[in-house]
Structures are given as C-alpha cells and as structure tokens.
Amino acid sequence: MVHYSDFTVDSRIQRQARALAERGDRVDCICLSDDAEFDVGTGTIALHRAASGKPRGGARAYLEGNARFLAGAARKVSALDRRERFDLVEIHNMPDVLVFAALRPKLRGVPLVLNFHDTFPELFATLFDRTARHPLVRLIRAEERLSAALADGLVFVTDEARDLLRERGIAGKQTQVVMNTPDERVFGERRPAAEPPRSGELRVVYHGGLADRFGVETLVRAVAQLRAQGEPVALDVYGSDAEAARQLAALAAEVAPSGVRIAPQPTPVEQIPERLAAADLGVVPTMRDDFTELLLPVKLLEYVHLGLPVVASRLPVIERYFGDDVLLAEPGDAASVAAAIEGVRADPVAARARAERASQRLAGIEWRQQRQGYLGLVDGLVAAKRAG
C-alpha cells in the first residue's frame, strides 16, 4: 500500500491493512510513519517512511510535497518489490498520481488498485480557492483520468463518489465501494444508543481535521452562544493540526473561556473509543462546498457506532444515509448548530431514539460487510493475474 499519510491515525488504511494481515497476508505500507513491523493475526504489517511529513503553505508547497512523496515512494516500492515480489499494489489517493510509484511492479504485470479516499480536483479547488476551469484544477482532472486508466481496480468510499467519477469517464475493469465504517475489532460491536443528560453539563465532542472546511470554528461559536444563554454545555475538540488548534484555542478563550477545551494532538484510531467515552453528543459541523458535498464523514459513523446522538451539517450524502436520524444544522451557521444542540438537551428521549435509528442504518453498511467486498476485489485481481 502507498499512502501519503500517517498510518497510526489513518483509519481507512488501518482497516484495510488489518483485514489483509489478519488472514495471513504481508502488507507493506509506504507512508509518513516511522519504519516499524508488527504481527496482526497470522500476517504482518510493515511500515516504511517515504517522506518526513507534509509541508505547510500554498498550492506550490502542497504540490511540491506531493512530488517529494511520490519520488520517495517510488524508490521504496521498487526496492521492496525486488525483495518481496508483490502480488498486488494498492495506491491510496491523494494525489492520484501516486500510481506512478508502482510503475516497476506494474510493468511486470502486478495488478494495481487505485483507492479514491477523496476526489482530488474538488479538494484542491476548495483548499486553494480555484475555480473548476483553473489550469491547475484542469491538470489535476487530467492526472486523475490518467492515473485511473493505469489501475486494474478502483475503490470508492461512497456510491456518490463512484457515480461522479463515472460521469468524468473514469471506470475500471473492476470497481468496489468500500465505505469508511468503524472496524468492530477496534470499536467493538455497535453500542446501545445513549440518552443525553436532562440536567447538568452536556458534553459535546468533535475529533478529526481542524482545517476551515471542517467547520470547527462554527461549533466553538455555537457552544459560546449556548453558554451565554446559561446552558451548561462543554466542548472537547481533538485534532492534530497544531497551528489550527492554536487559532481555535485563541477563539475559544475569547468567546467561551471556560467551556471549550482544544486538545492539539493526534488521536490514534485505537484510542478513539476511549477519547469519546465521556461525550454525550457528537457534532460534525462540516462547511458546504463542492468537495464536502461528496463526503460521508468518518467521525459521524464513529459517533453513531458508539451510540452517541449526532448533530451534523445538512449535506447531501449525510442526508441520504441518515435522513432525520441525525439532527441537521445549516453549514457555517453557528445559531443553527446551537439550536440543534439545544434540541438534544430539550428532548433527550427523542435524541436517544434518533441515535438508535441511526445505529440501525449503520448496521446495513458496517465494516464486516465492507471488508468482504474489499477482500473480494483484491482476491479477484490476484487470481486473474495468476491464471493469466
């Protein structure tokens, strides 16, 4: 596997690597994590660092960071392939062009899977305020098509992402939707829905990315509004972006000095259930743009799995999968988020009923089902290679 991320906090990578290793496979992950090797089930996961980290800055620094990781990953893949003789290589975007890191095994006939975590053109346009017609965005669309054409199999996170890429002419010989649902081996079985407290402090939690598009500033302001009205609401925020955490902490000190705690630290996947154990409510305040309209946030699925009521932004994919079984708020509107949180406090019985219905919806897409589809794709490609 090749992925431009830290293995310890990337839940999608971990789930899929563990699914393979548990049944006896060896999985080499070329990533941003320190070199390490450990047994999982009857197999092994080995981590290989290909770059020191992601640079901060504008579009140029972002693309240069991608290029450096691609070069380092290509060297690692080639060296490991000489020794291990890979049966399959899986590339996790972004960027899509990481498929070229697997050029050596691809040339000797090894099947290549491109796993679309996100749609890169939409994300790049959102990050750097570019239009769809900007030359760089058009170039990224071209590399997306070329990268997909090199792959033997394509993996998508939702039906919506698959359908969008099909509209752009991207289709593989074999495709599979593998959703980001929590791994029962890490999170345990789905927990019974919890009823928020009728009195006393309501503990709200957010964990994950702290970039502007995740809307955490809106959530901080919403909690500040509630506290100004005398509502005993507290917010815990967990995120690994130190600079964004510093800015959010400064905002919290200004608008809600005693009610918001910003924890600027990564949350390893296996620690998420413990971190969220004291929470009464999970909030997913994602902003609306072309990129986020395609998202079904992992954190939302984790809150539902753990039995928490959820307040989430009114976004198309969230509405499709959960309807009114999560309380919906308008993206970027602190008053709307505050009203939704207040609604949980006002009627905890209804909040628990919604959480229970959301949990039942999750039952239809949980990881044990996604795992079967993922392993089926991998095994089919490897079998076809060996037969041909």
Task: Describe each region flagged by the PLM.
Residues G343, A350-G364:
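A short, well-ordered alpha-helix in the C-terminal region of glycosyltransferases
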Residues E201, R246-L276:
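Nucleotide-activated donor-binding/catalytic signature segment of Leloir-type glycosyltransferases, i.e.
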Residues R166, T181-G200, G215:
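Acidic anion/phosphate-binding donor-loop and adjacent secondary structure
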Residues V326-A334, G343-P348:
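Conserved acidic donor-binding segment of nucleotide-sugar-dependent glycosyltransferases
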Residues P196-V223, D236:
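Conserved donor-binding/catalytic core segment of Leloir-type glycosyltransferases
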Residues D10-S11, F214, P266-R275, G282-V304, ...:
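Nucleotide-sugar-dependent
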Residues S33, E160, T181:
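Carbohydrate-associated surface elements
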Residues R104-L107, F120, H134-L154:
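Membrane-proximal helix-turn-helix segments that form the acceptor-binding/catalytic region
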